[in-house]
A protein has these predicted regions:
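Arg/Lys-rich, alpha-helical DNA-contact motif
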Residues: 51-56, 68
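Helix N-cap motif at beta-to-alpha junctions
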Residues: 13-14, 81-84
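Core segments of cupin and vicinal oxygen chelate
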Residues: 2, 8-53
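Exposed loop/turn and edge beta-strand positions of beta-sandwich/beta-sheet ligand-binding modules
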Residues: 41, 72, 108
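Vicinal oxygen chelate
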Residues: 3, 31-34, 46, 78, ...
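Eukaryotic phosphotyrosine signaling hubs
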Residues: 4-6, 72-76
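Generic beta-structure capping elements
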Residues: 50, 58-61, 127
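Short amphipathic alpha-helices within nucleic acid-binding modules
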Residues: 20, 83-89
Length: 129
């Protein structure tokens, strides 16, 4: 049996990324320096939803190389209990949604999209009744 463990994104600013994902409600779990041949090559930062095993791994490469998101990436969805509260925390951190939250159908889920500091799109979903 397989199980889902993590998704990894490459980042350019660990402090900005940490502030963003903590404002989303993810908890910072650990930092893992990657050393090869005596040199610090990268640092991995792990985040997760409290009470869940799956993680988001953010990798910062210390050599300064840059990355292109490409055309194949769409988004990752994160469920939130209170979309308005999450949006307020993000706004306090200087992060605006791509557009105001909206419902897919009457009485259904509400959602909005935001981008992290590296341009990764995150869909925030508050499930409806």
């Amino acid at each position: 049996m397989a199980r889902y463990l993590h998704t990894m994104y490459r980042i350019t600013d660990p402090e900005k990324s940490r502030a963003f994902y903590e404002a989303l409600g993810l908890e910072f779990r650990r930092e893992l320096p990657i050393v090869r041949d005596g040199e610090l090559e990268a640092t991995n930062y792990f985040f997760g939803v409290p009470g869940q095993e799956e993680e988001l791994e953010l990798t910062f490469n210390h050599d300064g190389r840059t990355y292109d998101l490409g055309t194949g990436y769409g988004h990752v969805a994160i469920g939130v209990d209170d979309l308005d509260g999450t949006r307020a925390r993000l706004k306090d951190a200087g992060i605006e949604p791509e557009r105001e939250p909206y419902s897919v159908r009457e009485g259904g889920s509400r959602l909005c999209f935001v981008q992290d500091p590296d341009g990764y799109r995150i869909e925030l979903i508050e499930r409806g009744g």
